Every structure is written in structure tokens, then in C-alpha cells.
Amino acid sequence: MLMMYMLFIMMKTYPMLSYHMMSYHIMLYTIMWYMKYSTYMRLWLLYKSYFIFIFIWTNNNYNNNYWYVTMLMNTYLYYNMNIHFLTINKKFLYSL
């Protein structure tokens, strides 16, 4: 319950935050989407995105010299945004 309240506050205060907080903005919506699924699916998603979560947690660092790292990160972010907006419950969207 406390975690949900913290998520709500962070979502509400996002426009006042700096660009440095974008990774947390992505994380919150990704976690909300991820928590809807069964334990087996959650484990599978974590397995598929293991390395990407490291980059997201480390300030979403694009300043690297490895082309495959950037490609994986962009793929992760692109598909997660699409999945989020396709699966979001409208009653939560309207309450923001």
C-alpha cells in the first residue's frame, strides 16, 4: 500500500522533476504493467530483460560505445511504451 502511494506521488509530481528522473518515470509504468501478469510470465520477462534493467537502474546511460547496448535499450523502451499504452486501464489514465 505504501509502495502504491509512493508510485502515485511520483507520477503526480513528474512534471516538476528534472530530465534526470526520466528513468524512474519509465520504471514506474513498466512495473505497473509487469505486476499484472502471472509469476511465470514475470520471471520470463525478467529473464528477457536482465541486462536492460541494469542500464535503466544506472540512470538510463546512453553514453556508451557499444552499439548493441544502445540498440537493446532503445528496443526495450520502444516496445515497453507501446505495450503500456495498449494495455493501460482507462480508469487509471483518466484519474491522473
From Swiss-Prot:
Q: Name one GO cellular component term.
A: mitochondrion
Alphabetized, the UniProt keywords read: Mitochondrion
Which superkingdom heads the taxonomic lineage of this protein's source? Eukaryota
Localization annotation: Mitochondrion
Q: Would you tell me the protein name for this molecule? A: Putative uncharacterized protein Q0032, mitochondrial
